[in-house]
């Protein structure tokens, strides 16, 4: 017993390979029988590749259903300041001690199907009208917490740079190596913001400084931290976790 208590804490970096192994496909493998998968998808399941193809088909079907049911007019629940979770839990695909500092020359790049590709400095972003929210952050791991953010509505920003609002995807890249993407309808939902502040203070590195996506209508892994580039595109961009089998639409 004492040897267990004296063991050093395991970092996220050490357990990350195991977490990746236990992703969404693993969950589906454990809950759906091969017979059910065959009936649902029509794939031959005698090999691992057949099972993976069947699970991929189910995930794509799930994405299509969620997209069809999504409404930009349906808002995530908001809360009073008294409901804010303190202390707020750090969460990322790496340990907190591995948080990267903001690059000295940081700018937000804008590309793809937009008219104005000029980069944005933090000062330019802060000069835009900001919108606040107190909403629930829901993690795919099964826990949630309530936080307060404020920032630029993503829809207003996309209109300002002349984005093609009929495009299918908005892709986000981060200077910590993370990436994710969302559908255009979700990007234009009024609560989707490019957050600059957390609890009425400029974002600190562990909370995604200097700029993060905050999208309360989706699971937490879609609210990418440490943004450095936004791209509007019709080509499916995937994402860090999405490319490993996680649900792409990830609605809540």
For each of these PLM feature ranges, what is it?
Residues 1-22, 36:
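N-terminal secretory signal peptides
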Residues 4, 23-24, 28, 71, ...:
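Short, intrinsically disordered low-complexity segments
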Residues 9, 25-29, 33, 68, ...:
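General helical structural elements
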Residues 16-18, 33, 83, 230-231:
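Alpha-helical interaction segments
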Residues 19-28, 52-55, 66:
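Twin-arginine (Tat) signal peptide motif
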Residues 26-47:
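N-terminal export signals
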Residues 45-252:
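Structured, non-membrane catalytic/scaffold regions adjacent to prosthetic-group chemistry
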């Amino acid at each position: 017993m004492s040897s267990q208590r004296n063991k050093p804490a395991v970092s996220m970096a050490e357990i990350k390979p195991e977490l990746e192994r236990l992703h969404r496909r693993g969950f589906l493998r454990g809950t759906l029988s091969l017979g059910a998968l065959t009936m649902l998808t029509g794939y031959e399941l005698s090999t691992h590749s057949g099972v993976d193809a069947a699970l991929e088909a189910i995930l794509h079907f799930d994405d299509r259903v969620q997209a069809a049911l999504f409404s930009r007019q349906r808002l995530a629940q908001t809360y009073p300041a008294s409901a804010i979770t303190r202390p707020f839990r750090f969460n990322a695909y790496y340990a907190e001690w591995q948080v990267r500092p903001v690059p000295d020359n940081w700018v937000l790049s804008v590309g793809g199907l937009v008219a104005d590709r000029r980069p944005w400095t933090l000062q330019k972003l802060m000069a835009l009208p900001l919108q606040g929210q107190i909403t629930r952050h829901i993690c795919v791991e099964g826990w949630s917490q309530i936080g307060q953010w404020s920032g630029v509505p993503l829809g207003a920003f996309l209109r300002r740079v002349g984005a093609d609002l009929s495009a299918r995807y908005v892709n986000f890249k981060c200077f910590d190596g993370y990436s994710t993407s969302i559908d255009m309808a979700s990007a234009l939902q009024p609560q989707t913001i490019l957050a600059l502040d957390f609890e009425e203070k400029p974002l600190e590195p562990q909370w995604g400084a200097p700029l993060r996506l905050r999208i309360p209508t989706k699971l937490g892994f879609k609210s990418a931290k440490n943004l450095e580039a936004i791209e509007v595109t019709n080509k499916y961009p995937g994402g860090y976790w999405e490319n490993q089998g996680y649900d792409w639409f990830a609605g809540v």
